Amino acid sequence: MKPKQSGNQPPKTGLVKEYFRNGQLCSVGKYRDGKKTGIWKYYLRNGKLKATGKYSKDELAGPWKWFRENGNLLQTGTFKNGKQEGLWKRYHPNGELYDEGRYLDGKKAGLWKYYDAKGKLSRMKNY
């Protein structure tokens, strides 16, 4: 979400909390000179954590985690310069690993492993 800025207002700086229309917290994080920076947290309408990770000069940077509505982990991964980089993992709704592999400059690279809902390796693919 980009904050609305108009006219000659100075860029946002400091801690910012954004809310859904129902008043529930939507996100919390810091701005520096109008750009997202540091750790941000995003929430679902039910109040549970949806995602958390770091920004650097308005770009995704470093490790991120996403969660399902029930609180279970959905996926984890790392960003560099706003692009997916390094090891990424996604999980089935039951918490078992769904797939894992690496990204290089925002694209799948090398061997990726895919698992069934019981956690058993079902296939592998090279990218």
Regions from the language model: what does each represent?
Residues M1-Y127:
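Glycine/tyrosine- and acidic-biased, solvent-exposed loop/turn segments at the edges of beta-strands
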